[in-house]
């Protein structure tokens, strides 16, 4: 992190002595630039191309050096469109990596990969900037104590709890509710924990980014009247951006989060939607740089790139960064190299199931596939652990019996199995929950359920105390008291119909 009062713009430092080169070749978003002998820029240095195109339009393109080719040439990847660039144009070596604004000035604002505001709310204070390329904290700086991060979402808190300062992956195919779950987590965490969040929109739809921004303004996470009171900074590099921007936007968001952790000594939440797009952009850049592809066409440096990002997301003695990352799973194949590489870094996984989404059970979190390293008796306590294990056993037995039920029907099951199926169906429905951010679609008010309430509810179902209630009473409710109240309402309605 550096204090730089002479910064001319967020992404680039003003230099007294300019090191100038010229464009030698343009291949889409990749530029080859020739520099004078002995004046070669370093890897990761930011280069700036300024000038006018053939119709007189102003051009200002920032690139990042990726390769030193020899013969005084470097190969750089552009962070914005290269339309209008021509061979021979002048290129300025800034002498430093891309640097972005950090600190309180970033809250409530939307930035691009260069740290430039894109929300039409005026300039941002850029006196304090930080380079996006940094090494991970030293081992001695890390904090190792284990504690649960309560989200207020029943299925998450009970079966795959999140670690404070950990990394959590949201896995699922297209359209099963990853982004809605992320929005709910931002909403709950801002309200329940009062924490600062940084949202990195990596290669996702611009419409979704806009929807999220509007949602945050409505919920008060972004305070329009007093922008400094906002609880989140947004960084976007969306689908329409060149691969260079999509590859680096995650680092821009992480750099902003690191400042809150290291300097302000805060607990920070870093949301990345979607980490797969970070890998995808790296794959595109790798091909453009002429590297031989690896398995399934991915870049050979996949593990290195993922590691350099993930190792910086950690808890130190100053504060913590808890990261929640949406992971798009191509063709729902968890063995694909991109999600498989991501798995290695995660403390918890929340797997979203298309089957549950088809049944209308939201959030469509798969209770048997989702895992957490925190679900151990010494961390969560015996009561929580035992309840979670019994819920999983009941659901697993129901899954095993489904083929028999499909062929022979429920009547052929033993009394014990019929009871297990009935309780499993109640549990399945009780794992659903109305979300605050989905109120506009469902008309049901959102519910935040504390961990103690969640455990109590599932214990009552497992003990058989609620065997007499209809299973639809457990669908889309908050705590167990709401389920019993809903059952009474259903009973009254059925009597009135008769």
UniProtKB/Swiss-Prot annotation:
<comment type="similarity">
    <text>Belongs to the ATPase alpha/beta chains family.</text>
</comment>
<dbReference type="GO" id="GO:0042776">
    <property type="term" value="P:proton motive force-driven mitochondrial ATP synthesis"/>
</dbReference>
<protein>
    <recommendedName>
        <fullName>ATP synthase subunit beta, chloroplastic</fullName>
        <ecNumber>7.1.2.2</ecNumber>
    </recommendedName>
</protein>
<dbReference type="GO" id="GO:0005739">
    <property type="term" value="C:mitochondrion"/>
</dbReference>
<dbReference type="InterPro" id="IPR003593">
    <property type="entry name" value="AAA+_ATPase"/>
</dbReference>
<dbReference type="Pfam" id="PF22919">
    <property type="entry name" value="ATP-synt_VA_C"/>
</dbReference>
<dbReference type="GO" id="GO:0005524">
    <property type="term" value="F:ATP binding"/>
</dbReference>
<keyword id="KW-0150">Chloroplast</keyword>
<comment type="subunit">
    <text>F-type ATPases have 2 components, CF(1) - the catalytic core - and CF(0) - the membrane proton channel. CF(1) has five subunits: alpha(3), beta(3), gamma(1), delta(1), epsilon(1). CF(0) has four main subunits: a(1), b(1), b'(1) and c(9-12).</text>
</comment>
<keyword id="KW-0793">Thylakoid</keyword>
<dbReference type="InterPro" id="IPR020003">
    <property type="entry name" value="ATPase_a/bsu_AS"/>
</dbReference>
<dbReference type="GO" id="GO:0045259">
    <property type="term" value="C:proton-transporting ATP synthase complex"/>
</dbReference>
<dbReference type="InterPro" id="IPR004100">
    <property type="entry name" value="ATPase_F1/V1/A1_a/bsu_N"/>
</dbReference>
<dbReference type="InterPro" id="IPR005722">
    <property type="entry name" value="ATP_synth_F1_bsu"/>
</dbReference>
<dbReference type="GO" id="GO:0046933">
    <property type="term" value="F:proton-transporting ATP synthase activity, rotational mechanism"/>
</dbReference>
<keyword id="KW-0066">ATP synthesis</keyword>
<keyword id="KW-0406">Ion transport</keyword>
<keyword id="KW-1278">Translocase</keyword>
<keyword id="KW-0472">Membrane</keyword>
<dbReference type="Pfam" id="PF02874">
    <property type="entry name" value="ATP-synt_ab_N"/>
</dbReference>
<dbReference type="InterPro" id="IPR055190">
    <property type="entry name" value="ATP-synt_VA_C"/>
</dbReference>
<dbReference type="InterPro" id="IPR000194">
    <property type="entry name" value="ATPase_F1/V1/A1_a/bsu_nucl-bd"/>
</dbReference>
<dbReference type="InterPro" id="IPR027417">
    <property type="entry name" value="P-loop_NTPase"/>
</dbReference>
<keyword id="KW-0934">Plastid</keyword>
<keyword id="KW-0067">ATP-binding</keyword>
<dbReference type="InterPro" id="IPR024034">
    <property type="entry name" value="ATPase_F1/V1_b/a_C"/>
</dbReference>
<dbReference type="GO" id="GO:0009535">
    <property type="term" value="C:chloroplast thylakoid membrane"/>
</dbReference>
<dbReference type="Pfam" id="PF00006">
    <property type="entry name" value="ATP-synt_ab"/>
</dbReference>
<dbReference type="InterPro" id="IPR036121">
    <property type="entry name" value="ATPase_F1/V1/A1_a/bsu_N_sf"/>
</dbReference>
<keyword id="KW-0547">Nucleotide-binding</keyword>
<keyword id="KW-0375">Hydrogen ion transport</keyword>
<comment type="function">
    <text>Produces ATP from ADP in the presence of a proton gradient across the membrane. The catalytic sites are hosted primarily by the beta subunits.</text>
</comment>
<keyword id="KW-0813">Transport</keyword>
<dbReference type="InterPro" id="IPR050053">
    <property type="entry name" value="ATPase_alpha/beta_chains"/>
</dbReference>
<keyword id="KW-0139">CF(1)</keyword>
<feature type="binding site">
    <location>
        <begin position="172"/>
        <end position="179"/>
    </location>
    <ligand>
        <name>ATP</name>
    </ligand>
</feature>
<dbReference type="GO" id="GO:0016887">
    <property type="term" value="F:ATP hydrolysis activity"/>
</dbReference>
């Amino acid at each position: 992190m550096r204090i730089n009062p002479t910064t001319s713009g967020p992404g680039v430092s003003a230099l007294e002595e300019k090191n100038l080169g010229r464009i030698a070749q343009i291949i889409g978003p990749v530029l080859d630039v020739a520099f004078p002998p002995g004046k070669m820029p370093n890897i990761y240095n930011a280069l700036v191309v300024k000038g006018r195109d053939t119709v007189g339009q102003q051009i200002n393109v920032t690139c990042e050096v990726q390769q030193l080719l020899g013969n005084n040439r470097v190969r750089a990847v552009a962070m914005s469109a290269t339309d209008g660039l021509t061979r021979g144009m002048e290129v300025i070596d800034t002498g430093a990596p891309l640097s972005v604004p950090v600190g309180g000035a970033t809250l409530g604002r939307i930035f691009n990969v260069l740290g430039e505001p894109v929300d039409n709310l005026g300039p941002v204070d850029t006196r304090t900037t930080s380079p996006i390329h940094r090494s991970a904290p030293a081992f001695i700086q890390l904090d190792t104590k284990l504690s649960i991060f309560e989200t207020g979402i029943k299925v998450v808190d009970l079966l795959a709890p999140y670690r404070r300062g950990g990394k959590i992956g949201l896995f699922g195919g297209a359209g099963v509710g990853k982004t809605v779950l992320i929005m709910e987590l931002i909403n709950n965490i801002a309200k329940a924990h009062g924490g600062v969040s940084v949202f990195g929109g990596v290669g996702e739809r611009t419409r979704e980014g806009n929807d999220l921004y509007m949602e945050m303004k409505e919920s008060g996470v972004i305070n329009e009247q007093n922008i400094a009171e906002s609880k989140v900074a947004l960084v976007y590099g969306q689908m329409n951006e060149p691969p260079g921007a999509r590859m680096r936007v995650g680092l821009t968001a992480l750099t902003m989060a690191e400042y809150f952790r290291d300097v302000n000594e805060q607990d920070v939440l870093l949301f990345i939607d979607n980490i797969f797009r970070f890998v995808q952009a790296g794959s595109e850049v790798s091909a453009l740089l002429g590297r031989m592809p690896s398995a399934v066409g991915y870049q050979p440096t996949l593990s290195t790139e993922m590691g350099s990002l993930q190792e910086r997301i950690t808890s130190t003695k100053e504060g913590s960064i808890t990261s929640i990352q949406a992971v798009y799973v191509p063709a729902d194949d968890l063995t694909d190299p991109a999600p498989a590489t991501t798995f290695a870094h995660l403390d918890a996984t929340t797997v979203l199931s298309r089957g549950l989404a088809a049944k209308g059970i939201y959030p469509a979190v798969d209770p048997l596939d989702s895992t957490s390293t925190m679900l151990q008796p010494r961390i969560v306590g015996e009561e929580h652990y035992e309840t979670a294990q019994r819920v999983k056993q009941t659901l697993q037995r129901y899954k095993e019996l489904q083929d028999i039920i499909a062929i022979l029907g429920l009547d052929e099951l033993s009394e014990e199995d019929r009871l297990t199926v009935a309780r499993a169906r109640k549990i399945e429905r009780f794992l659903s929950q109305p979300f605050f951010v989905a109120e506009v679609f469902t008309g049901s008010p959102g519910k935040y359920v504390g961990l103690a309430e969640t455990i109590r509810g599932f214990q009552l179902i497992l003990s058989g105390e609620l065997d007499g209630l209809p299973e639809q009473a457990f669908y889309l409710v908050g705590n167990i008291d709401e389920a019993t109240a809903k059952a009474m309402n259903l009973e009254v309605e059925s009597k009135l119909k008769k």
